[in-house]
């Protein structure tokens, strides 16, 4: 999938199909507030509760920076780029030129997160604080290109939190007279080309529709429920849960590509949230791994480093 700007004559036609939009941008303030609340709720009765509380602290710092240290306005630049490059992923992690604002956000994040940090975490924060600009850019490149072993899980969590905060603000500056174009690579985000965290089956205006939730820019894009979100095959899909088939979080597995992705059902629990509920169902991941299935998603708080 990719994005193109609609000419004026197509805007009215597109408006008639907004009940089934192929692409949804996040509301960052609402998203971070909901995520932090859900993490703390799940932490109360979860064996990994301490880690969920740790992640909730990260999310609340993201919200603080969103409200008090927003990035510069690049609307004109982004609109001009889309007009000149129709049918692209406008914030593609492999080609988009980051400004140094993300590094400024990182330093602000470190300063605000230190009161929550243990000695071990504090050592990581201080390393990042002292790193040169070129070192940080290299680490960001490795991280965004999925070379996690070049970064380390301890640093990756904080770097991704800040890069995601930077990217989600960029999505707010993209022109809204755009349309997601179906094409190749539907398993990655049409905005930034990152992998999903999970898929969410919506209720409300988009009742019953499945959207993949981006791990970086927090956008969601529609994919039909009858096919694998990774390889798009349809013949060997199975659904797994820890408790019952009415569970709000299940794993969708594909026998063709031997991968799985979690599916979250808002009609079963309206409070499900991709990152929080993914972290809250780690035992489901363990079950899938025992079946020899590979996770096709990225959770920025669970980087797998070989």
Swiss-Prot record:
Signal peptide: none annotated. It is found in: Cytoplasm. Keywords: Cytoplasm. InterPro entries: FdhE-like_sf, FdhE_C, FdhE_central, FdhE_N, Formate_DH_accessory. GO terms for molecular function: ferric iron binding. Belongs to the FdhE family. Necessary for formate dehydrogenase activity. This is Protein FdhE homolog. The gene is fdhE.
């Amino acid at each position: 999938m990719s994005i193109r700007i609609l000419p004026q004559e197509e805007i009215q036609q597109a408006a008639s199909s907004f009940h089934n939009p192929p692409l949804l941008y996040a509301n960052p303030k609402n998203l971070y507030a909901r995520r932090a609340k859900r993490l703390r709720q799940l932490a109360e009765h979860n064996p990994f509760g301490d880690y969920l509380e740790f992640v909730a602290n990260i999310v609340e710092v993201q919200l603080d920076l969103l409200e008090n240290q927003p990035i510069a306005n690049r609307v004109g630049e982004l609109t001009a780029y889309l007009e000149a490059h129709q049918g692209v992923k406008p914030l593609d992690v492999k080609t988009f030129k980051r400004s140094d604002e993300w590094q400024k956000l990182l330093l602000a994040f470190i300063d605000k997160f230190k009161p929550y940090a243990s000695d071990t975490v504090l050592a990581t924060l201080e390393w990042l604080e002292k790193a040169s600009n070129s070192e940080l850019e290299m680490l960001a490149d490795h991280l965004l290109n999925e070379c996690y072993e070049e970064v380390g899980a301890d640093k990756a969590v904080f770097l991704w939190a800040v890069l995601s905060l930077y990217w989600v603000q960029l999505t707010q500056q993209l022109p809204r007279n755009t349309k997601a174009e179906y094409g190749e690579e539907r398993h990655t985000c049409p905005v930034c080309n990152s992998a999903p965290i999970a898929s969410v089956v919506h209720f409300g205006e988009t009742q019953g529709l499945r959207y993949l939730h981006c791990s970086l820019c927090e956008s969601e894009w529609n994919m039909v429920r009858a096919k694998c979100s990774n390889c798009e095959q349809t013949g060997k899909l199975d659904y797994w849960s820890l408790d019952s088939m009415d569970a709000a979080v299940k794993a969708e597995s594909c026998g063709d590509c031997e991968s799985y992705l979690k599916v979250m059902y808002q009609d079963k629990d309206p409070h499900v949230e991709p990152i929080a509920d993914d972290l809250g169902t780690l035992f489901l991941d363990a079950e899938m791994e025992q079946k020899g299935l590979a996770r096709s998603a990225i959770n920025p708080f669970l980087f797998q480093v070989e």
